[in-house]
Amino acid sequence: MNPNFFIVGASKSGTTNISYYLNEHPDVFISELNEPYYFSRLDVSKNFKRESMITDYEKYLSLFKKAKKNQAVGEATSAYFSSPHAASEIRKMFPDSKIIISLRNPIERAYSSYFSYQFMHKNDQSFSEMIDLHQKQISNDEFYIYNILEPGFYTKHIKRFQENFAKDKIKIIIFEDYINNVFFTIESILSFLDIHTKINFHVQSKGAYRVPKNKVSRKLLENSFFRQTATKLIPTVSRQKIGDKFFLKQTKKPPMSQQERERLKKIYESEVSELEVLLDIKLPWSDFHVK
């Protein structure tokens, strides 16, 4: 079976969580490998390292070989959303696909992305320093797959998918609405995928901030061979459960400074206004509605 739907992002907006719940339904099959990156392979440089990235077409299709007839078949890669190439590449190979997009307050999304970047790259830059660097990349028209700001310019990325897929093939979710009513949102996505049988599922903690439990855990999680082996051998859901039990602990995320918040507000203010016009809705992001 070939994939017929894609959860494309935005990053740090619940895509992994959404794919987890969808995969609970017997009429849905989602690749066990989370974020295969296949359709963003043209975006990456020689210096890009991602253990789960697949560049071979046959290997990519093998991700879906266990799918059954009449199942909705999909995968989730948040890098597709801001990729200059992914939308058109998906359309070329799978033109009848459905696209699922989740949008989060871009200020909170960028801050969450910063912590992921720190963890993955052992980076000690402050949030403000990273904003400086990534703003410079955008100003110089440099596409960098790990840029923490670029995915938050939602309008242009949505338009890229709208240019490649019909309106009824694109489902847009507001992350904050999803968090407030997981059941309703998942049911609406299932309906979008033409699945009308309901399923009961247990709501997990959503996007909790986690850090390594100790120095040993950090060393293992920073080891590329360890991560690569785990990615190849252990399905995503099982890997997350093992990580939560043995390697990670939940803690309170350090607060964003008011200065940093105001800076991001200025970066995204006109973008949010444009997005509300495009979607014809009032977005629930209070940072942008204070008079």
Language-model-derived ranges and their functions:
Residues 1-77, 81, 92-97, 102, ...:
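PAPS-dependent sulfotransferase catalytic core
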Residues 14-15, 60, 74, 90, ...:
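Generic structural signal for small/hydrophobic residues in well-ordered secondary structure
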Residues 17, 85-88, 183-184:
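Generic recognition of short, well-ordered alpha-helical segments
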Residues 19-23, 61, 91, 111, ...:
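Non-transmembrane alpha-helical segments in soluble domains
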Residues 46, 77-78, 137-150, 255-260:
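Surface-exposed cleft-lining segments at the edges of enzyme active sites
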Residues 52-66, 121-202:
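PAPS-dependent sulfotransferase catalytic domain
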Residues 60-63, 86, 154-158, 185, ...:
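Alpha-helical packing segments of well-folded alpha/beta enzyme cores
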Residues 159-262, 266, 280, 285-291:
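The conserved 3'-phosphoadenosine-5'-phosphosulfate
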